[in-house]
Amino acid sequence: MLTLRHTLQAMPAEALEQIEIFEGGNQQMKKTQTKPDIILIVLDTLRADRLSCYGYSRETSPYIDAFAAESTLFERAISPAQWTIPAHASIFTGEYPTTHLTTQIYDRHNREQIMLAEALRNVGYNTVSFCNNPLLGVVENDLDRGFEEVYLYGGALPNRPAIADARPRLTGRIAQRITRVMRSITRPIQDRFARDNFILRIAVIPWLVPLWQRYANFKGNTALSLRDIVGYLRTRRHKGAEQPLFTFINLMETHLPFSPPKRFIRRFAPYYRKERKAYRFMQSYNHKPFDWMMPLTEPLTEMQDRVLNDLYDAEVAYEDHLLRHLFAHLNRPSVRDNTLVIITSDHGEGLNRHDFVGHSLVAYDDLVRVPLIVRFPQQRYKGMRVSTPVSTRRIFHTALEAVGLQHTGLDNGRVESTLTNLETSSLTRTLNGGDPEGGIVFTEAYTPETLLTLIKNEDPERVAAFRCNLMRRAAYQGNYKLITVGDKPDELFDVVHDPDEMDNLIGDEPVVTAELEKLLTAFVEEAEKRRPANQEATRVGLDDELVAERLRGLGYIE
């Protein structure tokens, strides 16, 4: 099978230089000397329904709202997965999890599937990642493949761009080199800690949690990373860089634990410091990741629910506030006119809905309906709001179409399916009134196996009670959404009139249920066929002796 990777590698340099660019999704092609910069912002763990521009009653997001008003907003964007690793893998490959199979913390992405950063780098882009989530940089899963520069703010020993180093040049270079060496030593150790079931059981002990949350920079540093990003982009602009730039940004502010600044607590939870029960609950809950991830045996109390949701809103507002300087830079006419900006999330958060607080096992919209805001170069499609359901995996197709890559240049004119056809899978097709997928979208909730093992060890009765070991999938068409558990229809919702998914219609709509079940069956068959010939995601296996040697070198063991 001729793949995107093989085609890009075979293209001569002169052909890459003459790649044509689609203008706003039109059929006409227009040659240009300048490819657009691309900025992909993933606001980790952000629910769409907590942004004001998505209809939320509280003013949580004035800066995002203002940016959305100048852009295109997709009202029903669905993440292909319910947690970080498979969701990002789908964004980076344009594939659903059943195809890319990067679904577990110990999976390494298949090299036959080209990543977005690789594709852009192959056609002349500089590629840089600013990431706050350790699962995308510290864990060795290859999701950072294709990036020339990777700046990690999560995990031990964060690294920052040289422009952020205020020390004298020589001192700064020496310090950066030492940091790189230490990172090369500690990264396999951190990776082992992240995926070892025994270590995970120890790590969730409440009195140990604050230690790794702080010293392993669990949430990274949103404020610092955004400051560095703006500085990096401004410096590059002032230097007159000739190559186009792809910038990936992951921010973790809305992920537990919740600890927003006091000014945002006063706005959204003014009672928090005065009501001891509320304060003590949240301080304790922040240090109980096992409770975040586990299905709830009983709902939180009214007080607990209120403080959890209010502090989440405060975190949303704080992150929005921090984004203002980046938006100011992106709103410069010279930047705005030739930059594709995409804002989305990998998943949402349960927040005491449907028996969950976190984002691990289920496929409800609390977890998989995410924001998707796109500002095209020249602000094409400005102000449009799109109600057609779309998958965020189509970010991949949209970005590659924007730089001129289309199916006739990727697979010799052979279109294997609409899932790989960049010309028809780009979001611009939906904007032009003819959605290539007919408004049909899927999501897949692969159970994180490390979490499943933890639940089995800590509270095995919950596994059966909540069917934790069974995979969930969902299909969307029109107003309806069908959720299957273990490949059997389980719940049917009219998500337009029942957005909270409280009224299960599966007994009332047998025809709709059967149609959506048929779509899901066909989808899984097609997704499995689309895997590369050698496909099984590589299960990362560290050399235990190598890890032990590095632990000894750091003085952790003898």
Label the model's feature ranges:
Residues L2-E558:
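Catalytic domains that recognize anionic headgroups
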